[in-house]
Each structure stands twice: as C-alpha cells, then as structure tokens.
Amino acid sequence: MLCGLAIVGANVATAQNIFGAGTVTCDDWLEYRNQNRKDREYQAQAWIDGFVSGSNLSRPNGPDILTSRTGDEVYAWIDNYCKAKPRDRLVAATWALVKELQSKAK
C-alpha cells in the first residue's frame, strides 16, 4: 500500500511527500507495539530504520548519528515521543529523532 502525505508538524515543515509506514499516527505506532501487532510493528520499524539510515547517509561529511545506537534505543525514543504526541505522524517522530541525534553528534 502506498500512501502520500505532506509532512507538516511541530518538528517537520516541508511540502515533500512520503510513502509507507511513516504516514501512520503515533497512536497507531503505540498500538502496534502494545497490542502484539508484530507484522505492523516490524513494518514501521523497517520504515524508521530506513529513514534514520537514509538521513545519516545523506550527510556523508557530517557526523555519524548512529554511532553507538541500537534499534531498541531508537524505538524507545519513538515510544516516548509518541506517548507525548499521539496525533503526530510517525514521520514527525522520526524526523524529531534525527534532528536530536544530529544535534548531539556535532
């Protein structure tokens, strides 16, 4: 299933479109994690992994934002963001994570 979404949120302000699991809400993400919906959870995790990895690779001369990070740490960060902002899209949570990792890696 391909879905397009203009990214607009507190931490994301762009007219670029995205596809895939990043279009689900944080509330959906938390449901996948808490209701044993592993198929959906793995799909969303793969989307997060790709987004964060792609963001890291898009800055080849910048610091590596994933040094000493595990997937579990990334997903726990997303969990906390989503608990605070359940109506945000997963892309907003993931973008906020990338921005935080970039600021700490400088």
What annotation goes with each model-predicted range?
Residues 7-8, 41-42, 47, 98-99:
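Aromatic-residue detector
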